[in-house]
């Protein structure tokens, strides 16, 4: 299932911040993780992901650096900043409140809150 653009605008940034919480990742790795770990629901193409990454970096929620991979190829790695960690904590609380509210009015089943936790990265 594909998510509508407006929902993706809200969920995309928090999903990227969460994936970067354990450690840095490069763009293709992030795109791949978004697709596989969300069952394709939050899959993003590069034309969506990279502007999102640049926006998060402009807000100082993530930082990037170039690094050589084992293949001697240069890759841009993204990492969560302290400011990004704080924002992620705030957004987690907001998403929990939103899911709770939608559950209370019957939009989501009561079991929806159980699946909020993501499995550990990597």
List where the protein language model places each region.
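Accessory beta->alpha helical hairpin/"wing" motif in late/C-terminal subdomains of nucleic-acid enzymes
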Residues: 80-84
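Residue-level detection of the helix-turn-helix DNA-binding "recognition helix"
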Residues: 35, 54, 58
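N-terminal helix-turn-helix DNA-binding core of bacterial DNA-binding proteins
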Residues: 4-50
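Short beta-strand/turn micro-motifs at beta-sheet edges
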Residues: 2-6, 66-67
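Amphipathic alpha-helical dimerization/coiled-coil segments
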Residues: 86-122
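Beta-hairpin "wing" of winged helix-turn-helix
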Residues: 57-74, 79
């Amino acid at each position: 299932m594909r998510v509508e653009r407006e929902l993706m605008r809200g969920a995309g940034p928090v999903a990227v911040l969460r994936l970067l919480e354990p450690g840095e990742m490069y763009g293709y790795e992030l795109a791949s993780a978004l697709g596989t770990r969300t069952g394709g629901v939050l899959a993003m193409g590069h034309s969506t992901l990279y502007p999102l990454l640049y926006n998060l970096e402009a807000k100082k929620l993530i930082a990037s650096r170039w690094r050589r991979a084992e293949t001697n190829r240069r890759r841009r790695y993204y990492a969560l900043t302290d400011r990004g960690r704080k924002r992620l904590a705030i957004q987690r609380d907001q998403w929990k409140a939103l899911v709770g509210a939608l559950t209370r009015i019957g939009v989501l089943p009561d079991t929806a809150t159980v699946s909020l936790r993501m499995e550990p990265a990597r």
